[in-house]
Every structure is written in structure tokens, then in C-alpha cells.
């Protein structure tokens, strides 16, 4: 059984007991969260597609780690022949969640 769920504007294909990294959101670790924006559910070959969402379908998750930083991304700007160089970098913040259950 799997589902396609929208979490913070991004769509993810999720299955039960799957660990997933999503964009960081403020919540305490271990607290259960329910996502209602379920777009598609596959229940052993029986596929239900929403228009655009499936009414009554939910995905229960819990937060394993509230803040996880991704790899550093470097951004380099340069203008030729002028000596202008600028190097910026940032690390994207993620939250690690665990899919507890998919309810139809």
C-alpha cells in the first residue's frame, strides 16, 4: 500500500514505516502529525485517485528529528576581467519524518 501525499507544496510517494526528509517545519520530535492532502492511494492494486484530493484519506506521521541540515551548497558569482568574485553558501534545513499509517 502506498499513497501520494502533498507536504508543504511538494508531492511525495510514501509507504508505511518509510523514513522521509521534508522541508523543515516547526514541531516537536515524537509528536504525531496528520496530513490530509492525499492525492492517490494504491491499496493492493485498487487505485483511488482524488479530484484533486481523496476525501477522508489521511497519512499519519511522527517526527524523528526536527532539524537536519543538508549538504553545503556553494554559489559562486564572477564577472570576467573586472576582478569581481563572490562566494556564498548555505545548508538547507530538513525534518526527518516516519510514516506511521495510511488511512482511507
UniProtKB/Swiss-Prot annotation:
Alphabetical list of InterPro entries matching this protein: bL21-like, bL21-like_sf, Ribosomal_bL21
Entry GO CC: cytoplasm; ribonucleoprotein complex; ribosome
GO molecular function terms attached to this record: rRNA binding; structural constituent of ribosome
Top-level taxon: Bacteria
UniProt keyword list: Ribonucleoprotein, Ribosomal protein, RNA-binding, rRNA-binding
Cited function: This protein binds to 23S rRNA in the presence of protein L20.
Subunit structure and binding partners: Part of the 50S ribosomal subunit. Contacts protein L20.
The protein, known as: Large ribosomal subunit protein bL21
Gene transcribed to yield this protein: rplU
